[in-house]
């Protein structure tokens, strides 16, 4: 039996395993640290909206809880935290 939490992303409620929540929280914190103060709020809102969209796609039919594997796959889709932020002139 696993402990689950309820989270709200982009005004959508999800049930998520405790270990999946910890992984997601660490990922979002790492991404946030890569962003400048000016872009942080908007970009984090966009990322949370995309995570919510991906969670919704994964939670079809009889699956009701986001697990660690779901979060790992979403992180793979979104990219590493180091890929966010930085000086756009360098790209």
Predicted ranges, named:
Residues 1-91:
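Soluble N-terminal domains of membrane-associated systems
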């Amino acid at each position: 039996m696993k402990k689950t939490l309820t989270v709200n992303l982009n005004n959508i409620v999800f049930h998520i395993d405790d270990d999946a929540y910890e992984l997601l929280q660490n990922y979002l914190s790492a991404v946030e640290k890569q962003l400048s103060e000016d872009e942080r709020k908007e970009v984090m809102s966009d990322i949370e909206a995309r995570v919510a969209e991906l969670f919704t796609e994964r939670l079809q039919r009889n699956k009701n809880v986001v697990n660690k594997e779901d979060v790992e796959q979403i992180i793979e889709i979104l990219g590493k935290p180091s890929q966010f932020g930085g000086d756009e002139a360098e790209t």
